Amino acid sequence: MIFLATLPLFWIMISASRGGHWGAWMPSTISAFEGTCVSIPCRFDFPDELRPAVVHGVWYFNSPYPKNYPPVVFKSRTQVVHESFQGRSRLLGDLGLRNCTLLLSTLSPELGGKYYFRGDLGGYNQYTFSEHSVLDIVNTPNIVVPPEVVAGTEVEVSCMVPDNCPELRPELSWLGHEGLGEPTVLGRLREDEGTWVQVSLLHFVPTREANGHRLGCQAAFPNTTLQFEGYASLDVKYPPVIVEMNSSVEAIEGSHVSLLCGADSNPPPLLTWMRDGMVLREAVAKSLYLDLEEVTPGEDGVYACLAENAYGQDNRTVELSVMYAPWKPTVNGTVVAVEGETVSILCSTQSNPDPILTIFKEKQILATVIYESQLQLELPAVTPEDDGEYWCVAENQYGQRATAFNLSVEFAPIILLESHCAAARDTVQCLCVVKSNPEPSVAFELPSRNVTVNETEREFVYSERSGLLLTSILTIRGQAQAPPRVICTSRNLYGTQSLELPFQGAHRLMWAKIGPVGAVVAFAILIAIVCYITQTRRKKNVTESSSFSGGDNPHVLYSPEFRISGAPDKYESEKQRLGSERRLLGLRGESPELDLSYSHSDLGKRPTKDSYTLTEELAEYAEIRVK
């Protein structure tokens, strides 16, 4: 047997230390399973000058002093022992050979304790050795797990049981190792200070799933019912793995957002929430929330969760998308252009999701784009009709914002067709309506009189600017002859245009001039008729008083086409306008009535096809009197 084969080694060690003095050698501690036996190896020595004929010995329990009457475990002289050890103790060694090995059988827990040996050589040659052995009665195998078990690294777990009973030898097996991959088992017998230990070694590579796994070892004794089991839980260390995290998150501006990060690791990880390299929150925990109150578009972006411990780290990201209405659009580009130039205007905004962008002018859609943050408006060759106010509108499901901008188109003067002259008796009034940008200069030329009057001569010309329209009015008084030719000339830095102004109501002027002559002729004819009637009716005394008065000039016929966009009361405006024109054309002490049949235009920035409206705020005019 292995036990007997290795026992001489213990004796060799003891023999080498013999020095001819009182002394004993035995293991300081020894273990055995309950219900089995234990052999306590023992060797003693005494001085060489003592030559006893017979050597006796006594084993005591828990005390080395006889006067304390300790329980006698074994006594070679009388075989009288304490009742607890009756039938349980036996001396295996030969005291004559200084071998005091003791065998205890049918172990029970109360037998655990200290065992002392006393040598009896006869007479006064008795000696109780201070050396003793402590017996430990066990009932579970001892499973030894390394202090650090790391996932992915091979580990060795040992199961150790005492093997100090020569009559019963344990057999070891592992329990619960099926979930540990493909483990290998090795067995060996190990001697430790005179005691023997049966060892089973289990080799395996643990995983993170093995953390907390309950691993068992069983010691069974053949041909008996004795079985002893021991268990140990594996504490497997492994790096963090993030197992719980929000997917992409969408939130409306101003709402509350809670981001969760959960990780599995041993030991627990340090969890850190970060954004753009900045730490927002951290804690040693299995899960960590990041709460964002009333989120803004500035908090839109990618958030990272970092989990780390001494064995590694893991990280994941989540994208937070903050949904919000478009910001007020910004407009970059040309705001002033020359007629014929190409104009490029960029309207941009920011929103989530991207908006629908539209550019309007007078409720007409000029350009639009869907789900884009920028819109480019291209006008390849601008005209005066492109001048005006534009709107860039951005909208999505969360709101709408708009920005107005103006495009100013600069162009050469255009004298509108409603420009004309009107005459009544000795007064001529000329109206020149010019559309231009920038504001032009206006001059009236009378070729027959070799006279040129411009708008700076306020006593003759009145001018008023409204939007792109410039209205200049020239008043000529004392014109008794045929109406003069009047040429209106307008110029700015882009060009010059001239137009001979047509006359309206020229036939009325003619009748006004021949009116006195016609009255004289009519009077002569009337006298002749009266004389004839008098001669034929001599008996009739008829006194006729005939008077003829030329009367006032006939009323001037006004035929305006009054078109003012957005006017609340068209007819009231017409009456005010007529009164204003009468004041403008009024003679000294008279109210001349002229035929002014010209269109009225909206003084705002309207297309040229709209008519011109003369407002009642015009002042009194100076007169040019022609002798």
Swiss-Prot record:
Knockout consequences: Mutant mice appear normal, excepting subtle defects in motor coordination and a slight intention tremor. They have similar numbers of motoneurons as wild-type at birth, but display an important loss of motoneurons during the first week after birth. Five month old mutant mice display a decreased ability to remain on a rotating cylinder. Contrary to wild-type, about 40% of mutant mice have severe episodes of whole-body tremor, both during movement and when resting.
Tissue: Detected in the myelin tract in brain, especially in the corpus callosum and in peripheral nerve. Expressed by myelinating glial cells in the central and peripheral nervous system. Detected in oligodendrocyte processes before formation of compact myelin. Restricted to the periaxonal space after myelination. Isoform S-MAG is the predominant isoform in CNS and PNS of the adult (at protein level).
Residues recorded as bearing Phosphoserine in the entry: S545, S547, S549, S591
Entry keyword Protein transport: no
Topological relation to the membrane, as annotated: Single-pass type I membrane protein
GO annotation, cellular component aspect: membrane raft; mesaxon; myelin sheath; myelin sheath adaxonal region; paranode region of axon; plasma membrane; Schmidt-Lanterman incisure
Subcellular compartments: Cell membrane; Membrane raft
Ig-like V-type domain: residues covered: 22-120
Transmembrane segments: 517-536
Primary location group: membrane
Glycan-bearing residues: W22, N99, N223, N246, N315, N332, N406, N450, N454
Alphabetical list of InterPro entries matching this protein: CD80_C2-set, Ig-like_dom, Ig-like_dom_sf, Ig-like_fold, Ig_sub, Ig_sub2, SIGLEC
Signal sequence, start to end: 1-19
Cytoplasmic topological domain residue ranges: 537-627
Gene3D superfamilies: Immunoglobulins (2.60.40.10)
Outcome (variant: R118A): Abolishes ganglioside binding
UniProt region (Interaction with RTN4R and RTN4RL2), positions on chain: 20-325
Ig-like C2-type domain boundaries: 139-237, 241-325, 327-412, 413-508
PTM entry text: N-glycosylated.
GO terms assigned for molecular function: carbohydrate binding; ganglioside GT1b binding; protein homodimerization activity; protein kinase binding; sialic acid binding; signaling receptor binding
Binding sites annotated in the UniProt record for a ganglioside GT1b (d18:1(4E)): Y65, P66, K67, R118, Y124, N125, Q126, Y127, T128
Coiled coil location: none
Reported function: Adhesion molecule that mediates interactions between myelinating cells and neurons by binding to neuronal sialic acid-containing gangliosides and to the glycoproteins RTN4R and RTN4RL2. Not required for initial myelination, but seems to play a role in the maintenance of normal axon myelination. Protects motoneurons against apoptosis, also after injury; protection against apoptosis is probably mediated via interaction with neuronal RTN4R and RTN4RL2. Required to prevent degeneration of myelinated axons in adults; this probably depends on binding to gangliosides on the axon cell membrane.
Recorded domain comment: The C-terminal cytoplasmic region found only in isoform L-MAG is required for normal myelination in the central nervous system (CNS), but is apparently not required for normal myelination in the peripheral nervous system (PNS). The extracellular domain is required to protect against axon degeneration. The first three Ig-like domains mediate interaction with RTN4R and RTN4RL2, but are not sufficient to inhibit neurite outgrowth. The two C-terminal extracellular Ig-like C2-type domains are required for inhibition of axon longitudinal growth. Besides, the two C-terminal extracellular Ig-like C2-type domains are required for protection against apoptosis after nerve injury.
Quaternary organization: Monomer and homodimer. Interacts (via the first three N-terminal Ig-like domains) with RTN4R and RTN4RL2. Interacts with isoform 2 of BSG.
UniProt name for this protein: Myelin-associated glycoprotein
Biological source species: Mus musculus
